[in-house]
Amino acid sequence: MLREIRPAIVLLLVLTAITGLAYPLAMTGIAGMLFPAQAQGSLIEKDGKVIGSALIGQEFKDDKYFHGRPSATLAPDPNDSTKTVSAPYNAANSGGSNLGPTSKALADRLKEDVDKLKAENPNAAVPVDLVTTSASGLDPDISPEAAQFQVPRVAKARNMPEEAVKQLVASNVQGRLLGLLGEPRVNVLALNLALDRAAAK
């Protein structure tokens, strides 16, 4: 009997060593050599300290910063382990709200968010990505239109000329991947850091 199952056991051990050890180590090593920043998580530093990643969004509430998309991520309720509480951009619990198009809760939240944004900039149409969550809840980017929509608020909060803030947005727009894939986008953290640098001059 052992003679019959020995080839299967040997094959299992060989494939486990190849796919579970050799391949992952090789890919990690190659990625580290060819794309060191990306292999480490595309981390962003300020004054020698890691403050975030270009791949994971953060919540900005202050009027002097650009805001990202709404996030529906949750965290355990510290007062009741059977419940959850809202925890925007919680990378430990990535996910969407799972609210469907007929959901009253979703419709009410959208209306509230749209009304708030229209009060902030009544002369412009509200970009859809400023009121809709992404599937992961961690989207680090917004559309150029969503960034331009926020220019008046940010410029006023920082006492900067709107044109200067618009130029900052324009200089932080990333194009389509390979000129074909995806849509133009603005990384919110990178834009806010550029804004801080410009304001410090």
Curated annotation (Swiss-Prot):
Keywords of this entry: ATP-binding, Cell inner membrane, Cell membrane, Ion transport, Membrane, Nucleotide-binding, Potassium, Potassium transport, Transmembrane, Transmembrane helix, Transport
Gene Ontology molecular function: ATP binding; P-type potassium transmembrane transporter activity
Residues passing through the membrane, by range: 7-27
One of the record's GO cellular component terms: plasma membrane
Cell compartments where the protein resides: Cell inner membrane
One GO process term, biological-process aspect: potassium ion transmembrane transport
Membrane-related topology note: Single-pass membrane protein
Family per record: Belongs to the KdpC family.
HAMAP family: KdpC (MF_00276)
Protein name: Potassium-transporting ATPase KdpC subunit
Protein's organism: Bradyrhizobium diazoefficiens (strain JCM 10833 / BCRC 13528 / IAM 13628 / NBRC 14792 / USDA 110)
Name of the gene encoding the protein in the UniProt record: kdpC
